[in-house]
Amino acid sequence: MALSAAHCDTWSESIVGALPGTTWHHRSFTEEIYCRACGLVLDWAGAILTPHARQLIADAIIMKGLPRIESDFKRMEYIRHMNQGIVFSSGRILGALSLLPLYPRYASLIDEAERDLHEMIANYVHDDGGTLEGMAYWSYTFSSVMPIVWALARYRGQTPAAYATDTLCKTGAYGLGMLSTVGDGTHYLAVNDAHLGGHYPPGLCAAYAGLSGDRRWLALYRSAMKAGEGVPDIYPV
């Protein structure tokens, strides 16, 4: 997958984003996805790739992914006050971390991206731990955050629980507070963007169980896995 993606001409959202003469770009959604995926391949499987293959993937992250992401962070202020900037941080940080064995100067980008991540989480989460978007967006946003927290904790030589900020833990308590009391109590309330019957993904539940020590998250994780609601993600790996 990573080698195929690295051979694509562009990681832009559409042909319009790479059309000569255009100034339009649909934000760095696909660039984030490919930076994240290719970064994980370099980190987890880089040792079994040839040096040339590693270089191809690294070059693609550097030239096709990170520049578009950096453009959004430098130009689009609004992404710092909603979930987009937080989600884009996944590809930005995991991609940059994967480059360090080849290019240690990317450490400065990691420092900047880490500061941005915590700033944006603080912007997104209110004093009571809540957010203005519904629980489906909340779930998606913090499912994107957790792998970054684990990766940055490893990079900084800390446990995830020690690395996690008070804001991140506080909004986890909000997630529990937004569970419905109807039925088995494992679904979140259908407010704002959320539909009836929505539930938090097992990976997010497992992550918050580890960060908070709250056994309710562990119960949610076990319930979701027992119901066969798990989807492939990075946590089982």
State the predicted function of each range.
Residues 15-20, 51-57, 157-164:
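Short, glycine/acidic-rich hinge or "gate" loops at secondary-structure transitions
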Residues 9, 42-45, 149, 179:
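Sec/Tat-exported extracytoplasmic proteins
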Residues 16, 76-80, 186-194:
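Short coil/turn segments at secondary-structure boundaries
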